[in-house]
């Protein structure tokens, strides 16, 4: 048994080596899982294709290559049985997580044709990301993440489905956490498919809303508002939030926007929002913003942070970092509240800011240049 002095690293054990080889340093299994998810292997097995020949026929794959994939999935505990065992091939309890109908939605998250797993392939460029600080997504796919989603309907639809797979967690709980009774007009900046603004408008039938987004998500938001019967109160403006915003409002909302951007870009976004505030207005920032920076689970916190860095050059910030960034844009924290959700794998809150000076928030001048919507 090895010994070491206090403060010195311990000698790794054979068990440590096993963990490194099989879990931490292994790229084969993560890709095998993604291929299984993309081919919907578990769903085909559940539908009766319980032999390799039947599975290859259903998935239009090379039988021998598929058999080697299945063998590895069996070794790692995703599948069990097979012809050599004299039993039908079937998913294990773990493998059932890859069924399309499972509420954890892991098949969709791992599907290589879906937005997140597609983007995860950019992690092959993580070395360059760490060396340069620049995201890898555009280098792999030819255009930045958000531009790609705006232009590719299939990717965008998969992204929207993943982000709103639990409407209660994604939109309803945060919408319930704030008092909208005195709000006249909400300007949702970078509001995606409109899920958050729709949840707010349905809870506050007196207010009007405007969503600013790129062309692709803007069109999806229009459909959502129309389907929800909100088209008479909620409008969509196609635009780039790095440019002047199209209207002013008494509440400007940034919902999970800032973590997608570098400090420099996030500051530009915040300053644009300040200019769109009407006198006495409030900026609401719904974001990952916990006190310590570790979230409810450090694994998900650091995983999300590296994804933000690799996909689009963003970063997950602590609550204090968000407050400091807002302060640089001329904002002061007025209040904060939890989102109303206790089940997300990382902490987030609603931070409410007000402009601290006329210089930082020239609302009177802005309201002359931008049409206010009552």
UniProtKB/Swiss-Prot annotation:
S-adenosyl-L-methionine binds at residues 171, 190, 213, 240-241, 255. InterPro entries: COMT-like, O_MeTrfase_dom, Plant_O-MeTrfase_dimerisation, SAM-dependent_MTases_sf, WH-like_DNA-bd_sf, WH_DNA-bd_sf. The record marks 307 as: Required for 10-decarboxylative hydroxylation activity. GO terms for molecular function: carboxy-lyase activity; O-methyltransferase activity; protein dimerization activity. It holds the Pfam family Methyltransf_2. It catalyses: 15-demethylaclacinomycin T + AH2 + O2 = 10-decarboxymethylaclacinomycin T + A + CO2 + H2O; 10-carboxy-13-deoxycarminomycin + AH2 + O2 + H(+) = 10-hydroxy-13-deoxycarminomycin + A + CO2 + H2O; 10-hydroxy-13-deoxycarminomycin + S-adenosyl-L-methionine = 10-hydroxy-13-deoxydaunorubicin + S-adenosyl-L-homocysteine + H(+). The keyword S-adenosyl-L-methionine applies. The record marks 260 as: Required for 4-O-methylation activity. PROSITE patterns: SAM_OMT_II. The keyword Cell inner membrane does not apply. Pathway: Antibiotic biosynthesis; rhodomycin biosynthesis; Antibiotic biosynthesis; aclacinomycin biosynthesis. The hydroxylation reaction requires S-adenosyl-L-methionine (SAM) as a cofactor. S-adenosine-L-homocysteine and sinefungin (a SAM analog) can also support the decarboxylative hydroxylation activity with 10-carboxy-13-deoxycarminomycin as substrate. Signal peptide: none annotated. GO terms for biological process: antibiotic biosynthetic process. Its EC number is 4.1.1.-, 2.1.1.-. Keywords: Antibiotic biosynthesis, Lyase, Methyltransferase, S-adenosyl-L-methionine, Transferase. Involved in the biosynthesis of anthracyclines, an important group of aromatic polyketide antibiotics used in cancer chemotherapy. Acts as a 10-hydroxylase to catalyze a decarboxylative hydroxylation reaction on anthracyclines. Homodimer. Homotetramer in solution. Tetramers might not be very stable in solution. Belongs to the class I-like SAM-binding methyltransferase superfamily. Cation-independent O-methyltransferase family. Contains an N-terminal domain involved in dimerization, a middle domain and C-terminal catalytic domain that binds S-adenosyl-L-methionine. This is Aclacinomycin 10-hydroxylase RdmB. It comes from Streptomyces purpurascens.
